[in-house]
């Protein structure tokens, strides 16, 4: 999504606050750090807010500006590029995106959006920012019009996603579900909190429920970080071995288990999930909540859509197959393996299940969950427009005994 060039590490230093434009100054600085330094939005913004003296109301406004502009960056670029005669430096590009987002996607009065955004750029750039944003304000896009009649040029631009994501989802979900799913993931994420205070999406909570582990069961969570599912399983009374391949992420599981008072029920192991160091048949349930493209949970990370590449999907699909193949021997006869991913792509869901049907015809698919889950071959899928949750796919198999 990057346009233009320029020095990295722009606008460093502690943020000085106190003027009416402070919120937009913080937002612009955050957008520059995300764009130029390739910083992660969910790390950059909280650190900057902590280093500011903004009010709670202004912090909420900055959060909406930064995450919203990041999500809708492609759409904002198209809105302003209609009226730009030349490429501009990164700070001006970021300010134009910021202004266009307020004009097109927020209920900010046009005069306020334009004047306050103009005020945060250097004096030499204020003329072009003012002129372009006024043109954007005067020429709103008709969402129902075609490309030749004042409408958006295409679906990917209107919804602000890379072409490949839209193309793949159209092929896998069809037009209506794709538009609804991508639109839902442009909305801010809903916070779901368990009764123990742990924040966990409802789709993830339902994966744990469908694992159906209870007191006396021995459960392996093969890709456990940050520990949401492992701790939920432990709360149900099971003994959990939580594995992760990276020591830092495994430490997150330990910290979360300790915070919830579950350290006695969750044993954390640093282990490569494709070569797990456990005895065959040693678990009643194995959960493979595999690394995936995350195309069902894009609302959680405003910049995720711009970071994932199409090439990564095939690499992740291969890893997912290796993880499931490594996990199957660990399930005792009569036990259950659950495979889950927060993606909507057939390559990471249906294709894997089809391979398992050929390689392991002995596996018995278990009953599908009810709505809002939808049938997905021998498994089920929840779309992100269903109930405010992430998109998720789930397959459950019993190992014959």
Residue ranges and their predicted role:
Residues 1-401:
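S-adenosylmethionine
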């Amino acid at each position: 999504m990057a346009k233009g060039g320029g020095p990295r590490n722009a606008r460093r230093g502690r943020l000085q606050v106190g003027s009416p434009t402070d919120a937009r100054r913080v937002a612009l600085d955050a957008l520059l750090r995300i764009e130029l330094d390739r910083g992660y939005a969910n790390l950059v913004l909280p650190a900057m807010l902590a280093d500011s003296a903004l009010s709670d109301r202004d912090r909420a406004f900055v959060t909406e500006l930064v995450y919203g502009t990041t999500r809708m960056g492609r759409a904002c670029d198209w809105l302003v590029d209609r009226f730009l005669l030349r490429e501009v430096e990164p700070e001006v590009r970021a300010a134009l995106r910021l202004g266009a987002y307020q004009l097109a996607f927020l209920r900010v009065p046009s005069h306020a959006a334009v004047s306050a955004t103009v005020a945060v750029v250097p004096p030499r750039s204020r003329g072009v920012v003012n002129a372009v944003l006024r043109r954007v304000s005067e020429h709103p896009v008709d969402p129902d019009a075609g490309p030749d009649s004042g409408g958006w040029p295409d679906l990917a631009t209107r919804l602000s996603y890379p072409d490949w994501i839209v193309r793949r989802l159209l092929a896998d979900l069809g037009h209506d579900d794709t538009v609804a799913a991508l639109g839902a993931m442009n909305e801010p994420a809903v916070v779901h909190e368990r009764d123990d205070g742990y924040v966990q999406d409802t789709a993830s909570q339902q994966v744990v429920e469908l694992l159906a582990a209870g007191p006396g069961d021995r459960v392996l969570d093969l890709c456990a970080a940050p520990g949401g599912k492992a701790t939920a399983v432990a709360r149900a009374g099971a003994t959990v071995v939580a594995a992760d391949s990276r020591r830092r992420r495994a430490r997150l599981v330990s910290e979360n288990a300790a915070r919830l008072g579950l350290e006695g029920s969750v044993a954390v192991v640093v282990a490569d999930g494709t070569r797990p160091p456990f005895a065959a048949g040693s678990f009643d349930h194995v959960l493979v909540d595999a690394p995936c493209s995350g195309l069902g949970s894009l609302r959680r990370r405003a910049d995720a859509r711009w970071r994932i590449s199409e090439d990564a999907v095939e690499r992740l699909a291969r890893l997912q197959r290796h993880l499931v193949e490594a996990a199957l021997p660990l399930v005792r006869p009569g036990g259950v393996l659950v495979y889950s991913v927060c993606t909507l792509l057939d390559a990471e869901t249906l294709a894997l299940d089809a391979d398992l049907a050929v390689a392991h015809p002995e596996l018995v698919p278990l009953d599908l969950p009810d709505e809002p889950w939808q049938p997905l071959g021998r498994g089920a899928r929840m779309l992100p427009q269903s109930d405010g949750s992430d998109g998720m796919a789930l397959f459950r198999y019993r190992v014959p005994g």
